[in-house]
Structures are given as structure tokens and as C-alpha cells.
């Protein structure tokens, strides 16, 4: 059996640009991509914390150190400048490997400041 598992996550980044007329994709600071292990042109799912929209696109690299998160093309209708996003990539791996798999989770605060890197999502408690 093959399972689809969380591979990389950018948690609570802020949209810095939104360009309806760009040909598509989501431009992400190359440093952020590296931290989460997301490759340029890799499929990503985006979850907008502010409006509940969930959509899929692909990642393209923005200049390292720029802190850019630019939602482009048709997806620009799903996110406005200042919105808080969760950006995820997934990997398909055999069941045996899935049981010991650890994602790369990057937490952000403020104006796209990387806060910390983790290898798991915290257990939710009551």
C-alpha cells in the first residue's frame, strides 16, 4: 500500500503579493522552499486561514531573502495581500516508510519571519 503523507509545510505565512494576470502558480521565497523541502514546480495545496479557501497550484521560486509569498493567476481570487496561509506539499511513500516518516514543518510569525523548524505537528489536546 502507498500512503500520501505531509512532506513540507509553511505554517502561517502572509501573502505579500497577489497578481491575477500572472500565468499562475505561487511564488515563494527560495529560503522558505528550501526550509520546507519544497521544489520549484512541485504541486502544493494552499489553505487560507482568513477566508477558508483551499486550492491547489504549484510552487515557483521567489528571490531568496525576499519573504515573498505571491499568489498568482486564477488563485489570486482566493487570497488577498495580508491573508494568512498554510502551504503544504505531499509525498506518496510505501506504508512501511510512512510509519516512520517525518515532515518538514516551518513556523512563521509576523511579516514572514521564520520562527522555527519542526519534524512533526504537535499533538492536539482537549
From Swiss-Prot:
It is an enzyme of class 4 (lyase). Is synthesized initially as an inactive proenzyme, which is activated by self-cleavage at a specific serine bond to produce a beta-subunit with a hydroxyl group at its C-terminus and an alpha-subunit with a pyruvoyl group at its N-terminus. Substrate binds at residues 57, 73-75. One of its GO terms (cellular component) is cytosol. Pathway: Cofactor biosynthesis; (R)-pantothenate biosynthesis; beta-alanine from L-aspartate: step 1/1. The modification Pyruvic acid (Ser) is found at residue 25. CDD domains: Asp_decarbox. Its cofactor is pyruvate. The active site is at residues 25, 58. Its main location: cytoplasm. One of its GO terms (biological process) is alanine biosynthetic process. Keywords: Autocatalytic cleavage, Cytoplasm, Decarboxylase, Lyase, Pantothenate biosynthesis, Pyruvate, Schiff base, Zymogen. The keyword Lyase applies. Belongs to the PanD family. Catalyzes the pyruvoyl-dependent decarboxylation of aspartate to produce beta-alanine. PANTHER family: ASPARTATE 1-DECARBOXYLASE. This is Aspartate 1-decarboxylase. It comes from Edwardsiella ictaluri (strain 93-146). The lineage of its organism: Bacteria, Pseudomonadati, Pseudomonadota, Gammaproteobacteria, Enterobacterales. The gene is panD.
Amino acid at each position: 500500500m502507498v500512503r500520501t503523507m505531509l512532506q513540507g509545510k509553511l505554517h502561517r505565512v502572509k501573502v505579500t503579493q497577489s497578481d491575477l494576470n500572472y500565468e499562475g502558480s505561487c511564488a515563494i521565497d527560495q529560503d522558505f522552499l528550501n526550509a520546507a523541502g519544497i521544489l520549484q514546480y512541485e504541486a502544493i495545496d494552499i489553505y487560507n486561514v482568513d477566508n477558508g479557501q483551499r486550492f491547489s497550484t504549484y510552487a515557483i521560486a521567489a528571490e531568496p531573502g525576499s519573504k515573498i509569498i505571491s499568489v498568482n493567476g486564477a488563485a489570486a481570487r482566493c487570497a488577498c495581500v495580508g491573508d494568512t496561509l498554510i502551504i503544504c506539499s505531499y509525498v506518496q511513500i510505501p506504508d512501511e516508510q510512512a510509519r516512520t516518516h517525518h515532515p518538514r514543518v516551518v513556523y512563521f510569525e509576523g511579516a514572514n519571519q521564520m520562527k522555527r523548524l519542526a519534524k512533526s505537528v504537535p499533538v492536539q489536546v482537549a
